[in-house]
Amino acid sequence: MAKQKVRIRLKAYDHKILDQSARQIVEAAERTGALVAGPVPLPTKIERYSVIRSGFIDKDSQEQFEIRTHKRLIDVLDPSQQTINALMKLNLPAGVDIEIKL
């Protein structure tokens, strides 16, 4: 018989908030007796943009900006209904994108 698992994928621009959210999820799942694998750090996506500083001339003068998207993966193995309810009631900070797959 195949075991059921819940895969939780977290994304955020700030790694401190992301790690705090991952810790809250792991603690909530472990309190209800579920096995937890993770948080596993996934590769950080870096988007870089170059913008010309002046509006008309001076192509050599550019500014570089980057956005870093940090990701974590948490697997909750063999969750009970109590585990799922505890995860749904969690109040996570703004700025953390959560994707849950059953």
Swiss-Prot record:
SUPFAM superfamilies: Ribosomal protein S10 (SSF54999). GO terms for biological process: translation. The keyword Ribosomal protein applies. One of its GO terms (molecular function) is tRNA binding. GO terms for cellular component: ribonucleoprotein complex; ribosome. InterPro entries: Ribosomal_uS10, Ribosomal_uS10_CS, Ribosomal_uS10_dom, Ribosomal_uS10_dom_sf. Keywords: Ribonucleoprotein, Ribosomal protein. Part of the 30S ribosomal subunit. Belongs to the universal ribosomal protein uS10 family. NCBIfam families: PRK00596.1, rpsJ_bact. Involved in the binding of tRNA to the ribosomes. This is Small ribosomal subunit protein uS10. The gene is rpsJ.
